[in-house]
């Protein structure tokens, strides 16, 4: 806990900048607090996973039969507008791997986000999106990562997450990036890519890591912080 406190405090309070954050996962609704807190701190916010579909739909894209929270489109637009007003960059997918059902080794194809079919399901980010994310990370000094880019537990829709994870590990080992990741799905994805040990720090605190990123004070962390005061 002591090590986690020190790492997270440095990353969120006094990071080397530019500071980038990757936020993925299924739903915007579960990470509203996280998105809003990070927008106040980061230089670049990279949005992936199912939650990116809600942002794409909010910006006028058809997302077919993809997971999408249509009741949160106005909220997504507000977040984008807030980011623009604060001079924060939001990075969304520019292409996607789609299929007509979620199944292992189902026939899939890569399409631009403005060409999603009515029966398509977005299941991963495409190669152009992967390269765009990697180019953003190459310019960053610090990264906080919570949530995968695609349906990583079903192959081949883990590839976007794996490629970004490997690039992050390489930047970290080259001394160009401080990389901190956490959350159950994130840790599982990094372990699947066999890169977790190559990140600067991987939190195993699960939900507590998410609450920290949301800006919530955690009792254990508050106690440690108090003990550190002279």
What are these model-predicted stretches?
Residues 1-230:
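Active-site loop-to-helix "anion-binding N-cap" substructures in soluble metabolic enzymes
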């Amino acid at each position: 806990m002591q090590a986690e406190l020190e790492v997270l405090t440095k990353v969120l309070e006094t990071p080397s900048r530019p500071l980038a954050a990757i936020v993925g996962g299924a739903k915007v609704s579960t990470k509203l607090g996280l998105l809003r807190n990070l927008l106040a701190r980061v230089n670049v916010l990279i949005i992936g996973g199912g939650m990116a579909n809600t942002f794409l739909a909010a910006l006028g894209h058809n997302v077919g039969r993809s997971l999408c929270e249509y009741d949160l489109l106005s909220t997504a637009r507000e977040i984008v507008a807030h980011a623009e007003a604060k001079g924060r960059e939001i990075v969304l997918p520019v292409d996607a791997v789609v299929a007509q059902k979620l199944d292992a080794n189902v026939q899939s194809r890569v399409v631009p986000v403005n060409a999603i079919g009515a029966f398509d399901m977005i299941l991963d980010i495409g190669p152009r999106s992967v390269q765009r994310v990697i180019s953003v990370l190459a310019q960053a000094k610090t990264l906080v990562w919570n949530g995968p880019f695609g349906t990583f537990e079903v192959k081949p829709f883990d590839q976007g997450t794996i490629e970004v994870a490997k690039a992050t590990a390489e930047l970290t080992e080259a001394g160009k990036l401080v990389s901190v990741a956490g959350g159950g799905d994130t840790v599982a994805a990094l372990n699947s890519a066999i890169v977790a040990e190559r990140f600067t720090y991987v939190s195993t605190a699960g939900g507590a890591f998410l609450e920290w990123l949301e800006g919530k004070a955690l009792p254990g962390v508050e106690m440690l912080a108090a003990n550190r005061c002279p």
